[in-house]
Design a protein with these regions (language model features):
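Short alpha-helical transmembrane segments in multi-pass integral membrane proteins
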Residues: 1-19, 77-142, 186-241, 304-370, ...
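Residue-level signal for short hydrophobic patches within transmembrane helices
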Residues: 12-31, 58-65, 141, 167, ...
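Transmembrane helical elements of multi-pass membrane transporters/channels
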Residues: 17-36, 138, 149, 172, ...
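Helix-terminus/linker motif at the lipid-water interface of multi-pass membrane proteins
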Residues: 31-50, 119-126, 182-189, 251-282, ...
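Hydrophobic/aromatic residues in alpha-helical transmembrane segments
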Residues: 36, 73, 114-115, 152, ...
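Small-residue-rich hydrophobic transmembrane alpha-helices
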Residues: 49-109, 146-165, 258, 278-342, ...
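Hydrophobic transmembrane alpha-helices of multi-pass small-molecule transporters
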Residues: 61-64, 176-177, 206-210, 288, ...
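Short runs within selected transmembrane alpha-helices of multi-pass transporters and secretion channels
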Residues: 70, 139-157, 165-173, 194-207, ...
């Protein structure tokens, strides 16, 4: 078995090779929803945008499942390879793939069975509900394929092939983008056309991802690798829980936000549907930035995991700090775009009246005001997951959404009305940033001390041997 370049290649080169394809692959996941939103907004109107927004929690739950198994199994694989345990790595990967399939089928069945109930819980109004039901009933068909594809992409990156992972996602996005205008406008299928275009794109990505099973280089599968092991499954889920819990929290906050916006919006001149549609556009625009941060995080994960397992702590620190610098560049560009060009961005998603644009611009500028720092929490959570400290990673993943954003979204509107929903975002972002800096700072200091101790051991070994001889 050849030596893994994760252990010796220069960190900037590794991060470029791993993060850039991961960013592209992660962006594709957001583009699936963005492309639908743009074409549906142009073809159906703002009620169509509101409908895709109401159905969006199905996608975030799907991603949570994919991250639970995908990040969990990939983290296990990276640690096992770093410790030179190839059989354990194969077992982790095999069990992860089986879990992806099982969870995907269960999710489809549960979603279709309770579709109407879930859409109402997600905040669908009377006017939006029929559009949302038509869209969600179709897109749920593609969820099992999406779970396997997203989960496999993490394993493919852990195997040292981030470009192939990127190709899998890009092919599906291209097909989706081509089919969207054909199905929506040419075939006149409306919102259903956008849904079918998404599903077909996901199936093509799934086929490409599954083909990689016979191409793994650092992992050598045997039949036993795919036998579901409860202990191994629990280890996988425990290591993926931090990334997954963050997505689950995103889903919860989406539901709370949608219901808060419709409730407090009804008390204002904006009504119920305008805040719902505007929220969807702002969130999905921000999802592009978050996708880049997630891509950087996923690209950094195998580098950090492998070198932590190999006790090369100086490389762990270097990888994390470089990822933070990349994030700062992206966040600065995003801040400028959101604060100075909000109406231009919102106009991409279709037309609306003056009230619609007034609220959407206000929403974007206020809610995304602290975009400069909100990526640090995601990178830090992934950092702890990569080094095997899944509990701390899960705790950090939950800070922004669960500990800060949910209570603020419930409490601030009591004093500030619908404006309180918007203000909750930047306050939660800044609070999570402070906590992330403190926790990661403590961990990096521990690793620095461990590096010093290891260097002393290496120095003393030759001296002791000379003394014996």
């Amino acid at each position: 078995m050849t030596e893994n370049p994760l252990g010796y290649e220069k960190i900037p080169k590794l991060l470029k090779n791993f993060a850039v394809p991961s960013i592209v692959a992660s962006l594709v996941g957001s583009i699936y929803n963005i492309v639908d939103q743009i074409f549906i907004g142009q073809g159906v109107g703002y009620l169509g945008n509101a409908a895709t927004n109401v159905a969006y929690p199905f996608s975030t739950i799907c991603l949570a499942i994919a991250l639970l198994v995908g990040i969990g199994s990939a983290s296990r694989v990276s640690l096992c390879l770093g410790r030179k345990e190839p059989k354990a790595a194969a077992k982790a990967a095999g069990n992860g793939i089986v879990l992806m399939g099982i969870f995907g089928i269960i999710y489809l069945l549960v979603g279709e069975t309770f579709l109407s109930l879930l859409l109402k819980a997600f905040g669908a109004t009377t006017d939006v509900f029929p559009y949302a039901k038509q869209y969600a009933s179709i897109t749920l068909i593609g969820m099992p394929f999406l779970i396997v594809t997203n989960g496999m992409s993490n394993l493919i990156r852990a195997d040292g092939k981030p470009k192939y992972s990127m190709v899998c996602m890009v092919v599906g996005a291209i097909i989706n983008t081509i089919l969207d205008p054909i199905f929506i406008f040419v075939c006149d299928w409306g919102i259903a056309g956008g849904a079918w275009a998404t599903v077909i794109g996901q199936i093509f990505s799934f086929i490409l991802a599954l083909r990689y099973l016979w191409r793994f280089q650092t992992i050598h599968f045997e039949k036993e690798s795919f036998l579901l092991d409860i202990k191994e499954s629990l280890k996988i889920c425990s290591m993926g829980i931090s990334s997954s819990s963050n997505q689950i929290a995103v889903t919860v906050i989406q539901i709370i936000q949608y219901n808060s916006l419709t409730y407090y919006g009804a008390l204002t001149k904006y009504g119920t549907d305008i805040p719902l549609a505007a929220c969807g556009i702002v969130m999905k625009t921000n999802a592009i930035i978050l996708a880049i941060v997630v891509g950087i995080s996923q690209g950094t994960q195998p580098i950090i995991g492998f070198n932590y397992g190999a006790r090369q702590y100086h490389r762990v620190r270097e990888a994390y700090m470089l990822a933070i610098k990349w994030n700062l560049v992206v966040s600065t560009i995003a801040f400028i775009a959101f604060q100075f060009f909000p109406q231009s961005i919102i106009s991409l998603f279709g037309d609306g009246d003056e009230l619609y644009f007034e609220f959407a611009v206000l929403f974007m500028r206020t809610y995304l005001f602290m975009v400069l720092v909100n990526g640090v929490q995601l990178l830090s959570s992934s950092f702890f997951t990569a080094i095997g400290k899944s509990l701390k990673g899960a705790l950090l993943a939950l800070t922004r959404q669960t500990f800060f954003l949910i209570p603020l979204t419930l409490l601030l509107p009591l004093r500030f009305g619908i404006m309180g929903v918007l203000l909750a975002g930047p306050v939660a972002d800044f609070s999570a940033f402070i906590l992330s800096v403190v926790l990661v700072g403590i961990e990096l200091k521990k690793q620095k001390n461990a590096t010093h101790i290891l260097s002393l051991i290496h120095i003393s070994e030759p001296t002791r041997r000379r003394g014996i001889s």
